Curated annotation (Swiss-Prot):
Keyword Zinc-finger listed: no
Compartment list: Plastid, Chloroplast
GO MF annotation terms: mRNA binding; rRNA binding; structural constituent of ribosome
GO biological process, alphabetically ordered: translation
InterPro entries, alphabetized: Rbsml_uS13_C (IPR027437), Ribosomal_uS13 (IPR001892), Ribosomal_uS13-like_H2TH (IPR010979), Ribosomal_uS13_bac-type (IPR019980), Ribosomal_uS13_CS (IPR018269)
SUPFAM superfamilies, per database record: S13-like H2TH domain
Species for this entry: Arabidopsis thaliana
Organism classification: Eukaryota, Viridiplantae, Streptophyta, Embryophyta, Tracheophyta
GO cellular component: chloroplast; chloroplast envelope; chloroplast stroma; ribonucleoprotein complex; ribosome
Domain of life where this protein originates: Eukaryota
Protein name according to UniProt: Small ribosomal subunit protein uS13c
Signal peptide residues on this chain, from the entry's feature table: none
Transit peptide range per the UniProt entry: 1-47
Length: 169
């Protein structure tokens, strides 16, 4: 039988669970299994690593691939079609299938390479001082959205400006 450890708890917990009547220990303690007891049923959770990212093991491949930056719904479906692979749960994949999936994903620009590419593209726009580059520099939207009322994400928090005060005579 597992060892038990007594932990102090609030009176309300013992009253809610009606635990105080059956407890051989004092009224303010709660017995829990000791943490140093060995667990015979070890739980093994295997996360697959694809494209430098640990994708969730308990989801289908189509949705797991979307955790990789640069792979969305369409690209994930296209990868499965190209490999002629069924959309099963990630942890049920064989090691060979995982290797083939890694090879296919590595053909695309993902994660750090994609982020670097986008950052360099924005930097180039800023250097040539085109309209989009200037809007990036100013921290404003560059795709034609109105800025009078919205675009708080780019402009930041609203700053209160003191208006004209009426002078009392």
């Amino acid at each position: 039988m597992a060892q038990m450890v007594a932990m102090p708890v609030a009176h309300s917990l013992s009253l809610i669970c009606n635990w105080a009547k059956s407890n051989p220990l004092s009224r303010n303690t709660l017995a829990l299994p000791a943490s140093n007891t060995p667990n015979k049923q070890s739980l093994s959770i295997r996360c697959a690593r694809v494209g430098g990212v640990e994708i969730p093991a308990n989801k289908r491949i189509e949705y797991s691939l979307q955790y990789i930056h640069g792979i969305g719904r369409t690209r994930a479906r296209q990868i499965l079609v190209d490999l002629q692979m069924e959309n099963k749960i990630t942890k049920d994949m064989a090691e060979e299938e995982l290797i083939i999936l890694r090879d296919e994903v590595s053909k695309y620009m993902i994660e750090g390479d994609l982020r670097r590419f986008n950052a360099l593209a924005i930097k180039r726009l800023k250097e040539i001082q085109c309209y989009r580059g200037v809007r990036h520099i100013q921290g404003l939207p560059c795709r034609g959205q109105r800025t009078k009322n919205n675009c708080r994400t780019l402009k930041g928090k609203k700053i209160a400006i003191a208006g004209k005060k009426k002078v009392s005579k």
